[in-house]
């Protein structure tokens, strides 16, 4: 089993913590990670685009002039698509872009990005993040002690609302619960900071 340094909240070392090789030592699969990122981004799309077809645009439904005898081309309605202001043919309609990859593929994708963090030495494990009050300055001090200056994804155990509130005003920090860790966030943020409890929860879910 691989292991990484376990840090205290003040940035000092507190021994080592073992990592489950089935999660943290997987050969990263870039193709699967790409598919997972595209899936998540597609699921975030609003899909509210819409245009009016010939039944929705304003205008009369009667023939603009009689069929024969005028010398002009025959027309059935001023709402036809060839008219200025007429309806759009085969235009976009509201739809959901969400879809799901197979569960095994999604699990391989999250394991791949987590393993990549270990390979890049971008994984930081802290024995706990406990604050008396939700103060942004206090959380910034913790990051300074851990020597984290890059964008950071902080994964907390359930119920740690004080730490989550302390970090939410920091521009380069995002906080998610252990159950909410996902491929897109891990890819978007350089550093991955886990509490020891969050690490255990992730390994329970993915093992």
Curated annotation (Swiss-Prot):
Any one GO MF annotation of this record: structural constituent of ribosome
Signal peptide: none
This protein's record includes keyword Ribosomal protein: yes
UniProt-listed InterPro entries: Ribosomal_uL4, Ribosomal_uL4-like, Ribosomal_uL4_dom_sf
GO biological process: translation
Keywords, comma-separated and alphabetical: Ribonucleoprotein, Ribosomal protein, RNA-binding, rRNA-binding
Domain of life, source organism: Bacteria
Entry GO CC: ribonucleoprotein complex; ribosome
UniProt region (Disordered), positions on chain: 45-78
Database matches in Pfam families: Ribosomal_L4
Family: Belongs to the universal ribosomal protein uL4 family.
Protein's name in the database: Large ribosomal subunit protein uL4
Organism: Lacticaseibacillus paracasei (strain ATCC 334 / BCRC 17002 / CCUG 31169 / CIP 107868 / KCTC 3260 / NRRL B-441)
Gene for this chain: rplD
């Amino acid at each position: 089993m691989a292991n990484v340094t376990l840090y205290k909240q003040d940035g000092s070392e507190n021994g080592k913590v073992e990592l489950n090789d089935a999660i943290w030592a997987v050969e990263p699969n870039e193709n699967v990670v790409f598919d997972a990122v595209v899936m998540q981004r597609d699921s975030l799309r609003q899909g509210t685009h819409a245009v009016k077809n010939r039944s929705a645009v304003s205008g009369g439904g009667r023939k603009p002039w009689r069929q024969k005898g005028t010398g002009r081309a025959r027309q059935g309605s001023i709402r036809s698509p060839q008219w200025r202001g007429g309806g759009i043919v085969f235009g976009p309609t509201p739809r959901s872009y969400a879809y799901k990859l197979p569960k095994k593929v999604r699990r391989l994708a999250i394991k791949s990005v987590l393993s990549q963090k270990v390979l890049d030495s971008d994984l930081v494990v802290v024995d706990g993040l406990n604050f008396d009050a939700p103060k942004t300055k206090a959380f910034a001090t913790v990051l300074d002690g851990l020597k984290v200056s890059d964008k950071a994804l902080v994964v907390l155990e359930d119920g740690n609302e004080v730490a989550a509130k302390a970090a939410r005003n920091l521009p380069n920090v995002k906080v998610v619960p252990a159950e909410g860790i996902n491929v897109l966030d891990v890819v978007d943020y350089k550093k991955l900071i886990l509490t020891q409890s969050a690490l255990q929860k992730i390994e329970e879910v993915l093992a």
